[in-house]
Amino acid sequence: AVDRDWAEKIFLPYDKLLANGRVVHGTALAVRGTTVEVSGHGQIEADYLVLATGTAYPFPAKHMESSSVIAKARIERVHTNLEHSSRVLIVGAGAVGIELAGEITSAFPQVKVTMLEAADRILPAGDYKPEIREAIADQLAQRGVEILTGDSLSFLPPVDVGVLSPFRVTTQGGRQLEADMWFRAYGSAAA
């Protein structure tokens, strides 16, 4: 959403992925040996079966739109919104949130970014050395990113992710946060 050219690079039709084989998108109803019954596709016999359920990430890391045209338009709207924003809230300071904060402050240096992390430190998951966390926090601080840890939102912002609409939210710790738009950078899960 930060890089205008990114959307053109990430959407690839699945039917062009394999030279010897095909991609079938559907719900597996039954598996018997090397045969899978897939809703809308009937029974499919294969030498090898790959069950790739994927991972669900919040937008803009992953798009749920069924059409790349719709997804690309949404990304373009977010980019335009970032151009007109002065304050962005990123909820979550794991790897995704940190990357997003870096991208936003690089492409839009006029935007003030606040990161809110429920855990007591950035990069809460994983076995990161304290020196790594400190170095990343220092780099973000040099970019003007405010990092708030050990606190969480009392309620989600009253606007959708990536939409430009100024709002105010309160954290569980009583902080009042104001932003023009927000991003959810937590909650990845197996699909």
Give the role of each language-model region:
Residues 1-22, 99-130:
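Beta1-alpha1 glycine-rich phosphate/pyrophosphate-binding loop at the start
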Residues 7-12, 72, 76, 130-137:
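Short, surface-exposed alpha-helical segments at coil->helix boundaries
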Residues 16-89, 172, 176, 183-185:
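FAD-binding core/adjacent interface of flavoenzyme oxidoreductases
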Residues 23-26, 30-37, 110-191:
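A Rossmann-like FAD-binding core segment of flavoenzymes
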Residues 58-60, 73-117, 189-191:
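Rossmann-like dinucleotide/flavin-binding elements
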Residues 66-70, 107-108, 132:
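Glycine-rich, phosphate-binding/catalytic loops in enzymes
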Residues 67, 93, 125:
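Glycine- and other small-residue-rich loops at beta-strand/loop junctions that grip anionic moieties
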